[in-house]
């Protein structure tokens, strides 16, 4: 492997998102997005406000370079095993 590609993690030929850039809470929110539940349900499960859930979603989509909550949910579903790992 060429050293310039050492940091690349690939799955099915695509670069794996940099989940390490997320905070613990952002990772929790992202993992819960895979369930397709609305923000108020995520807020209730996490014991935080819906506004805080929206803030976490805004932050994690920016960090991962994805434009929408729906795409974040699809990404979370695709990597659900990675996100739920301890």
Predicted regions and their residues:
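Intrinsically disordered or compositionally simple regulatory linkers and C-terminal tails
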Residues: 1-19, 84-86
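Residues within the DNA-recognition helix of helix-turn-helix
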Residues: 25, 56-59
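DNA-binding alpha-helical recognition surfaces that contact promoter or target DNA
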Residues: 31, 55, 74
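Residues within the helices of the helix-turn-helix
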Residues: 40, 58, 70
